[in-house]
Amino acid sequence: MILVNGQPVESLDVRDRGLAYGDGVFRTLRAQAGEPLWWRDHIAKLAADCAALLLDAPDETGLLAEVRRVAAAGQGVVKIILTRGLGARGY
């Protein structure tokens, strides 16, 4: 599942700065029984990473709801990737 600004999409634009330049952050979470493990630790690290890159951190409540929805199948891994989005070429 791919969400862009909270909306599901089929693919990402190749001009996304996260894809082109690695301009973003990510967290990989383990889910068990439909719940992300160590959520508080992951969301704290995600917020700190966003602050370091001057990215807006996602709404925690909304993000947790999406993670739970994806993890509802039971056990697995959820990867959260936040990018700066579309932007001009260059660093």
Region annotations inferred by a language model:
Residues 1-91:
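Conserved alpha/beta cores of soluble small-molecule-handling proteins
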